[in-house]
C-alpha cells in the first residue's frame, strides 16, 4: 500500500479496500520499524483520531480526494498542540499555540498527519546532517544523504512512510532532496503559498510546497496549499487555478531552454546523460529545444550566501532564551543568558550563517556586501526575464551529482556549491520543480523544470506528460 499515490488511495477508500484507520495504522507501523530517522515527532494518537473522522466523512458521502490520506509535515510549520522544533535544540521543547496557515488548510480537507519530519536546523543545509535530532538516511542507500533541508520529508515519501509530505524551499530545499530521493517536488512562485506560521529562515526566499510520488499528486496537494493569506504580507492576492485541469494538455510545440551554464564543468557525466535523455523524451513528444544563457548564474551562490544569512540573522534574533525556546541554566546576568542560550541552543551551521549575516549588515559593510548582493540579484532576475521571452520552460539538472556519503563533505563551501542549479529560482522568485529522470551509480537523478511567474499549471502539465511516458517515478528503493 505504501507505493500507492493519492489518487490510488482515494479510490481504495471508495472501493472499501481499506479504511482510513487501517491505512493510518499501516503507515504508523512502517514508521515504527524504519531506521531512516525521517521523523522528529510521530503523532500516532492524533493521526488515528483524524483517520476516524475521515472514515466518518467518507461514510457520510462528504469526502474529497484528500480525505484520510496520511501525510508527513515538515517540522518548520507550526502545529497547534504539537511540538514544532525546526530541527533545533533551541525549539526542542516548543509546542506551538497556533496552526500555520498551511497546517490549517491541510486540516480543513481532513488529511491525516502522521508526524513532523526531520530537517536541517532552521532549514539551513543541503544534506539533512545539521539537525539536532541526527542525520536522515537516504532510502536508496542508507550510507547516503537524502538532501536538505527537507530531507526527512523526501525520505518519508521515498521510503514509503507517508503518501506525501510538505517541504519548504529557500535555495533548493524541496527540489534537491526530491531529486536525490527520486520523488516529485515543486516550489511554487514566491507568494503563492502563505508563510504565516512557517518558521522563517530567509523571508524573501522561503516558499512552501508539496513533495509527492507524482506530478498529479503534487497538483492535488498544491490546490489546497496555495492561496492568498492576509496574515502574510508577502502572499499575493491572485486566484488559484485548479492545477489538475491542464495535466493532460499536449506539450507539442513546447519550447525548452537549456542554459549552457547548467552543463559546464562540475556536472557529473552520468547525471548529464540522464538529463539529456529526458530532454530527448520531450523532443519525441513534439517539444523544441533551444540553448539559452543565464550569464549571471555564476554569482547566484555568493549572492544567496549574503542575502539569506543577512535575513536569517535578523529572523533568529527573536530566539533569545527569554520568551520561549532553550534557556541556559545558572546564568550570571541577562547578557550571559543571551550569550549562552544562543551558543548552546543553535548548531554550528546556524551560528555560522548568523555571524556571516550580522557581519554583512554591520556598519561600513552593508553597501559593500548586502546592497551589492541585492543589485546582482536583480541582474539574475533580469536574465530569466530575457530568457522567458524566447522559451516556455527551462530544463536542467537539480544537483551536480547524486547523493553523496553521509559525513563526507566537511567543508561548508563545498556543501554550498551543490546548490548552484537551484538557488537562482529562489533569488528570482520563480517556480521550480524536480521530477525523477533516471539513475546514476544506482542513485536517483532529478530533472529540474523552472518556469515563468505563476506557471505552476504548465510545469505540472509538463511533468505529468513526462511521467506518462516514463516509469522513473514508479521505481522504489529495495530497502523499503
Swiss-Prot record:
PROSITE patterns: AMIDASES
One term under GO cellular component: glutamyl-tRNA(Gln) amidotransferase complex
Source domain of life: Bacteria
Annotated transmembrane regions: none
Catalyzed chemical reaction(s): L-glutamyl-tRNA(Gln) + L-glutamine + ATP + H2O = L-glutaminyl-tRNA(Gln) + L-glutamate + ADP + phosphate + H(+)
Signal peptide (from-to): none
InterPro entries xrefs: Amidase (IPR000120), Amidase_CS (IPR020556), Amidase_dom (IPR023631), AS_sf (IPR036928), GatA (IPR004412)
Active site: 74 (charge relay system), 149 (charge relay system), 173 (acyl-ester intermediate)
GO biological process: translation
Gene3D superfamilies: Amidase signature (AS) domain (3.90.1300.10)
Keywords, sorted A to Z: ATP-binding, Ligase, Nucleotide-binding, Protein biosynthesis
Coiled-coil residue windows: none
Family listed: Belongs to the amidase family. GatA subfamily.
Summary of the function given for this chain in its UniProt record: Allows the formation of correctly charged Gln-tRNA(Gln) through the transamidation of misacylated Glu-tRNA(Gln) in organisms which lack glutaminyl-tRNA synthetase. The reaction takes place in the presence of glutamine and ATP through an activated gamma-phospho-Glu-tRNA(Gln).
Binding partners and assembly: Heterotrimer of A, B and C subunits.
Protein name: Glutamyl-tRNA(Gln) amidotransferase subunit A
Organism in which the protein naturally occurs: Ruthia magnifica subsp. Calyptogena magnifica
